[in-house]
Amino acid sequence: MAGINGAGPSGAYFVGHTDPEPASGGAHGSSSGASSSNSPRLPAPPDAPASQARDRREMLLRARPLSRQTREWVAQGMPPTAEAGVPIRPQESAEAAAPQARAEERHTPEADAAASHVRTEGGRTPQALAGTSPRHTGAVPHANRIVQQLVDAGADLAGINTMIDNAMRRHAIALPSRTVQSILIEHFPHLLAGELISGSELATAFRAALRREVRQQEASAPPRTAARSSVRTPERSTVPPTSTESSSGSNQRTLLGRFAGLMTPNQRRPSSASNASASQRPVDRSPPRVNQVPTGANRVVMRNHGNNEADAALQGLAQQGVDMEDLRAALERHILHRRPIPMDIAYALQGVGIAPSIDTGESLMENPLMNLSVALHRALGPRPARAQAPRPAVPVAPATVSRRPDSARATRLQVIPAREDYENNVAYGVRLLSLNPGAGVRETVAAFVNNRYERQAVVADIRAALNLSKQFNKLRTVSKADAASNKPGFKDLADHPDDATQCLFGEELSLTSSVQQVIGLAGKATDMSESYSREANKDLVFMDMKKLAQFLAGKPEHPMTRETLNAENIAKYAFRIVP
């Protein structure tokens, strides 16, 4: 039957072949039913006898060279030409269509139900017949629900998308807030093991849905206009969101909610259609997140709340078996020198609900890691002074020996103590300079940095830290009594050994210490001719200026407002505490 493949829903034969015999109710069950061209006849009209349709169907089912489209047409009962012109999906094999044809011959209710089931099964794909669903079946709706949860929680979808891209490129990433993590872990239990960047169906569908939503948000974002209401309103901050991004939009629409928002820096309202249509006035309702430091009793309440959370987190970490000294060193390295926290400690911090990273746009004052570091120093106390025998200096080559200046680590340092775990190159270099009076910066750095190109960067950072520390004596002064009246007040370690003021970077402060430069850092700059004023400068945050210099060496940003802070303008923010 060379021409049988030409049969199908269109009811046509091979080009140029026609059936010279009219369709009739004669015997078509034998081989005489085919024309001399051996091509099947046109489908019978709807009012043709049922026996004719059965005979034609039996004939076609016995033909082996049937195409898949023809077998589907047969399984559907060979509908008329006009109905069969609808596009048809690929069907199962001819063996799956044969039971349907035999079932129609019996004309019993059970057979009719079975035939209907076969016709229903005929609309499925080969993957469905094999018992497997197509790719992403159910994964796309699931991924869309996850994205909607993030939108409802007010998450920064663009930031999450950037985090995923960085993770897939094996770059360093900043983990999202606890709210976002809880949503993602609900759907990706192995999130921390990299499930979000895996090739699973749900992860792939989620990344695609997230990118679509980010593009839609960018396309639908209204352009900023210069028109403003008569009341001056602050501009929206570009600071990325933090763990407080999950606060609901309904709180923002109430007076109490907006007041609470003022007390929570870096809070961003959720981007939803309801918020966009809430007001037609061109007023930006987000309070400014930059240069905003909580004042008065509110800041005391926030600090007490942070201390309580930090104490509870320390108990949880101790129950997990985390070494407290290792934790203190890891926190100091991360806060001061921006070095990543080790993975085992990071997982432990995740277990107690603390994100193991500090957002680059976030104030250190409200970060849980900072509260944890202060609580840890309070619990462990100052580090015991270790008596170390000074290592002998590297011998200097004789002057008569000809050598290139950088061909060896020649140094005249007399004291080179062991390096602490929490010290980076800048901190260690500054300590070596203090232990070796008269030594130069380049000479000191050459004693412990081998790479000559890295050496140049370390020298520049150390000089920046030293220049900042030299500004200490030029700062405006605040008496110890006035500092004590601050909220929270300054408490010298010599006077309050059990409740001394902690440095922003962890250590207890004392004016009698020979290695500390105690200052109060204001949140707002004022002219050098003005004395300290709580109304103008805001409340002070007390710290060691040497630690602040190390913090600013790599990235000169104000730890609270993220404005530029360096040796040129430190005197406008800092006040020296005097007895």
Curated annotation (Swiss-Prot):
Main EC class the enzyme belongs to: transferase
Effect annotated for changing S35R: In strain: T1
Region (E3 ubiquitin-protein ligase): 337-579
Places the protein is found: Secreted
Keyword Oxidoreductase: no
Keywords: Hypersensitive response elicitation, Secreted, Transferase, Ubl conjugation, Ubl conjugation pathway, Virulence
Database matches in InterPro entries: E3_ubiquit_lig_AvrPtoB, HopAB_BAK-bd, HopAB_BAK-bd_sf, HopAB_E3_ubiquit_lig_sf, HopAB_PID
Record bears the keyword Secreted: yes
GO cellular component terms, semicolon-separated: extracellular region
Note: Unlike many effector proteins, it is widely conserved among diverse genera of plant pathogens including Xanthomonas, Erwinia and many strains of Pseudomonas.
Molecular-function GO terms, alphabetical: transferase activity
EC identifiers of the protein: 2.3.2.-
Protein name: Effector protein HopAB3
Record region (Host recognition): 1-336
Annotated family: Belongs to the HopAB family.
Record's subunit section: Interacts physically with plant cell Pto.
Task of the protein: Effector protein involved in gene-for-gene resistance in tomato plants. It is recognized by the host Pto resistance protein and elicits Pto and Prf-dependent hypersensitive response (HR) and programmed cell death (PCD), resulting in host immunity. In susceptible plants, acts as a virulence factor by suppressing PCD and HR-based plant immunity. This function requires its E3 ubiquitin ligase activity probably by recruiting E2 enzymes and transferring ubiquitin molecules to cellular proteins involved in regulation of PCD and targeting them for degradation.
Chain positions covered by the region annotation Disordered: 1-140, 214-294, 384-408
Gene: hopAB3
Organism: Pseudomonas syringae pv. tomato
One BP term from GO: symbiont-mediated perturbation of host programmed cell death
PTM note: Auto-ubiquitinated.
Highest taxon, organism lineage: Bacteria
Compositional bias annotation for Low complexity: 23-39, 89-101, 219-248, 266-281, 384-402
Signal peptide, first to last residue: none
